[in-house]
């Protein structure tokens, strides 16, 4: 080690020699150099943040349907630009390919295939205010503004864009329930900020029922609207505080200023308050060059008073520190991302941590600082002992998103499970949610997939909820005779295609959910329930046609649907499958893959059918499935029914084929660019698939006691489990060429089976893959499923 000589070591009374002086000067010069050019720059440079790797634009172009604006983890408010309101391509409000922005709204869904939210549009203007948005083809006709991606940026907790029409810079920041918009105006005698209550993401078919605006003082606005959208009855309030008092303000109703006019009305009409179905507000100013006006905003499903309370509790009245909000949210993201620390390239880190970011955007906190929330019954409830969440895309997220939460987000998973149970308590039909959205059941998709979320959580050690009460909710939901062919399913063992659409898919997904109920019953010592639901869990065989080797629609008399095309995609009354084909759904029996393999003629024939799926040559793109991309033959990674299929190779003793396909999907359908998602992210499911797959294992069968080993895509990961244990994955020799598993060691022991027991994972330890460029066809052939 180099040391700096000390003058104190010179002999007493002896002057330093010339050579000693030279050495001292040289050493001092080196010391000054180190301080000036090494230590000081490091002192001024922040340590790397995991949130620096987040790329919010991923998924905003094409089918991903994500939004670029800021949100706290699982936050209640999501400030983001909207470029359209009427198309499924802008279900999140924003499409990267659009060239103009309608405005900036306070709430957004992430990755869904149906639009909703996009509440309360704010838009700065210069000149005579415009009250209509105009069109994408002619944005100058309205308050839309052109923009360029060269003058747009986004990072964790922050968004910025320059509006080219009016030279206004817009910046957005968001906390959990409140956020801030910062507008930098040019000099103008006619600057304004429009608030449009009629705006929401409508898909051309939804309706604003009622709205209300109130000017609380010369810098505070509150409002409300009731929307009949995807969520049938959605109440939302907002509060906004402006950093600069209004020079002038106007409430507009159907394009006219709300004010007293003795010739038009015989009653006094306040200019400070209005109700109707087409309300807008204009805050008008004279601005100096580069003058900044900020607007603090918050939302509530309860009342305007609660929205103000949410706002003032998160951003106090006197606090206009925009950077403080950005920094606080960025810090929250750093804490969440630190649950998994990885080693890899910049591409690896940006792809992985953006995936975690998307997986942790939803479900959304749905309660005020008071603990109040609007429930399924439209009444006001108080969340006692838990935080209430909403936006449960369960048909998607039961597969990988919630299993991820069970491992590394157990407290939130517990709160989410309690939110599902609260929904059940408030449901007129005594059902757990199917697809819940801000206190509403949308009845979207199929199955009763709150069941695997609860069962997997409980069996993975998630605590804090009443397991017996949860089991009763699961059982009651499954036995409800009025739900989607459930009565016929209970009687016949399948959902008949002459009585119910998407019947084959419903049969298969009900059977899986019943398996999950059985596992919960087993854990609780309820043997009769276990036996009953395990019998129902075997319903796959009831819709498997041996003559075709495929799952097929069957009517109430036991006759197969004719004609039958295993590759046909359909929706509606004549469709037996949900957003998929018979070939794809024929591989869905995750609760008993060995039985499925046996029905298909054994492992060799099963692998042949898997190969045929990937090698299928599609003559024409399937109709009505334009948003389902990521196609490799008839494997469609852009939609959830395919997500587990690659891992089925492992059950048949050929995990090297899984490795090839997994890396193909990762390299072609994920990344760090706006178009890097091949399908709707669906509240994080597409992203959660990547997270698990990159780690080298995947929950093919949630609520089981094992994961399936695949082929890792990152060199090292340290997973901080919710129970405090640390699980480390290492992929030795991993490269773009070395994608095949040669051997595995689990906690130092040779591991020859392609299954990872949860009992091993939960205690922490290490999983070490050795990778190579060619398949090792000996490893993983021991494919007996853990029992």
Predicted region positions:
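Hydrophobic h-region of N-terminal signal peptides that target proteins for export
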Residues: 36-45
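Sec-dependent signal peptide recognition
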Residues: 26-34
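Ser/Thr/Pro/Gly-rich low-complexity, intrinsically disordered segments
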Residues: 7-8, 53
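Accessory carbohydrate-recognition regions in carbohydrate-active enzymes
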Residues: 47-402, 406-452, 456-508, 516-542, ...
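Short, low-complexity intrinsically disordered segments enriched in A/P/G/S/L with frequent Arg
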Residues: 9-18
């Amino acid at each position: 080690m180099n040391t700096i000589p000390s003058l104190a070591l010179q002999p007493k009374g002896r002057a330093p020699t010339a050579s000693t002086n030279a050495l001292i000067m040289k050493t001092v010069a080196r010391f000054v150099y180190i301080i000036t050019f090494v230590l000081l720059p490091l002192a001024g440079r922040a340590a790397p943040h995991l949130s620096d790797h987040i790329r919010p634009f991923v998924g905003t172009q094409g089918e991903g349907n994500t939004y670029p604006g800021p949100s706290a983890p699982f936050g209640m408010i999501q400030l983001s630009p909207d470029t359209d309101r009427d198309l499924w391509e802008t279900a999140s409000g924003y499409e990267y390919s659009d060239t103009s922005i309608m405005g900036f709204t306070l709430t957004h869904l992430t990755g869904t295939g149906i639009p909703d939210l996009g509440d309360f549009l704010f838009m700065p203007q210069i000149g005579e205010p415009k009250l209509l948005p105009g069109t994408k083809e002619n944005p100058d006709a309205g308050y839309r503004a052109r923009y360029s991606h060269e003058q747009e940026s986004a990072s964790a907790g922050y968004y910025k864009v320059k509006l080219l029409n009016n030279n206004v810079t817009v910046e957005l920041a968001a906390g959990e329930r409140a956020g801030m918009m910062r507008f930098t105006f040019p000099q103008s005698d006619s600057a304004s900020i429009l608030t449009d209550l009629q705006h929401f993401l409508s898909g051309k078919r939804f309706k604003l029922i009622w709205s209300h605006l109130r000017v609380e003082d010369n810098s505070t606005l509150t409002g409300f609207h009731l929307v009949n959208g995807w969520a049938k009855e959605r109440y939302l309030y907002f509060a906004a505080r402006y950093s600069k008092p209004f020079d002038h303000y106007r409430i507009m109703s159907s394009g006219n200023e709300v004010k007293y006019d003795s010739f038009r009305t015989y009653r006094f009409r306040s200019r400070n308050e209005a109700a109707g179905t087409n309300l807008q507000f204009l805050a008008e100013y004279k601005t100096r060059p580069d003058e900044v006006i900020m607007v603090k905003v918050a939302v509530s499903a309860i009342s305007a008073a609660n929205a103000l309370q949410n706002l003032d509790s998160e951003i106090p009245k006197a606090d206009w520190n925009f950077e403080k909000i950005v920094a606080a949210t960025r810090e929250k993201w750093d804490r969440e991302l630190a649950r998994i620390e990885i080693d890899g390239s910049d591409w690896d880190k940006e792809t992985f941590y953006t995936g975690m970011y998307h997986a942790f955007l939803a479900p959304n906190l749905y309660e005020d600082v008071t603990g109040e929330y609007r429930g399924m019954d439209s009444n006001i409830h108080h969340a006692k002992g838990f935080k209430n969440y909403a936006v449960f895309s369960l048909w998607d997220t039961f597969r990988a998103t919630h299993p991820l939460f069970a491992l590394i987000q157990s407290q939130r998973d517990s709160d989410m499970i309690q939110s599902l149970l609260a929904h059940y308590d408030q449901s007129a039909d005594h059902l757990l949610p199917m697809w819940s959205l801000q206190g509403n059941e949308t009845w979207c998709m199929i199955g009763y997939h709150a069941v695997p979320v609860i069962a997997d959580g409980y069996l993975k050690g998630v605590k804090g909820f009443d397991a017996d009460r949860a089991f009763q909710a699961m059982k009651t939901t499954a036995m409800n005779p009025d739900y989607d062919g459930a009565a016929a399913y209970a009687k016949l063992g399948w959902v008949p295609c002459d009585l119910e659409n998407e019947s084959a898919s419903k049969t298969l997904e009900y059977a899986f959910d019943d398996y999950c109920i059985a596992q919960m019953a087993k854990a609780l010592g309820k043997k009769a329930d276990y036996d009953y639901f395990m019998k129902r869990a075997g319903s796959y065989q009831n819709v498997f046609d041996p003559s075709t080797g495929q799952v097929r629609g069957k009517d109430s008399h036991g006759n197969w649907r004719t004609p039958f095309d295993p590759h046909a995609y359909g929706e509606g009354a004549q469709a037996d499958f949900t957003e998929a084909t018979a070939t794809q759904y024929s591989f869905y029996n995750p609760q008993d893959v060995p039985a499925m393999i046996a029905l298909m003629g054994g492992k060799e024939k099963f692998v042949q059918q898997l190969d045929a799926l990937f090698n299928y040559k599609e003559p024409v793109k399937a109709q009505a499935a334009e948003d389902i991309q990521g196609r490799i033959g008839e494997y469609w990674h852009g939609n959830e029914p395919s997500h587990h299929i690659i891992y089925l190779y492992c059950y048949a003793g050929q995990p090297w084929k899984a490795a090839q396909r997994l890396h193909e999907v990762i390299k072609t359908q994920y990344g760090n660019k706006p178009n890097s998602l091949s399908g709707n992210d669906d509240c994080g499911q597409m992203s959660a698939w990547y997270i698990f797959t990159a780690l080298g294992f995947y929950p093919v069968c949630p609520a089981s006691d094992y994961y399936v080993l695949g082929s890792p895509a990152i060199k090292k990961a340290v997973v901080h489990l919710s129970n405090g244990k640390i699980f480390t994955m290492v992929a030795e020799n991993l490269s773009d060429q070395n994608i095949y598993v040669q051997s595995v060691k689990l906690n130092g022991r040779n591991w020859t089976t392609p299954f990872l027991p949860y009992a091993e994972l939960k205690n922490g330890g290490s999983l070490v893959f050795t990778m190579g460029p060619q398949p090792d066809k000996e490893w993983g052939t021991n494919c007996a499923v853990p029992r």
